[in-house]
A protein has these predicted regions:
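A residue-level marker of the well-folded mature domains of exported/periplasmic proteins
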Residues: 1-131
Length: 131
């Protein structure tokens, strides 16, 4: 690993951070962004530096969230992999909190379905993506 840096979960900071890292390192093989907004910023910085992603011999770009915009970039081959972080889990969490506050018993474990999106499977999911 060459470096670990934060883009503070924003597109602007993601772009700034990626631009700085591109200035520090000549050969970046893999870029992992912990959310799609930082990835969008990183993509801007990469484009401005003339660096393409996703293809053979190009940096691999991995993102987290699974937003529709990111899935479109997966389909285009700009992002190699996007791992879902389902925003709909908040409703379940609110129900669990309400149940606990009401003194009701809740399950000890809950599992949310998450997906991993690649160019090979993204077409199955992109049309139904509502976030």
């Amino acid at each position: 690993m060459l470096a670990s840096a934060t883009g503070e979960f924003t597109q602007t900071k993601g772009k700034e951070t990626m631009a700085r890292l591109l200035g520090e390192f000549d050969d970046i093989d893999v870029i992992v962004c912990q959310n799609d907004d930082m990835t969008f910023g990183a993509i801007e910085a990469l484009k401005e530096a003339g660096v393409k992603t996703g293809g053979v011999g190009e940096p691999v770009l991995i993102s987290f969230d699974g937003t529709r915009k990111a899935l479109e970039l997966v389909k285009e081959g700009v992002i190699n992999v996007d791992v879902e972080c389902n925003p709909n889990s908040g409703e379940l969490l609110a129900q669990i909190i309400n149940d606990l506050e009401a003194g009701r018993e809740v399950d000890k474990a809950y599992y949310m379905e998450e997906k991993v999106f690649t160019k090979e499977n993204v077409d199955e999911y992109i049309e139904d993506r509502n976030y």
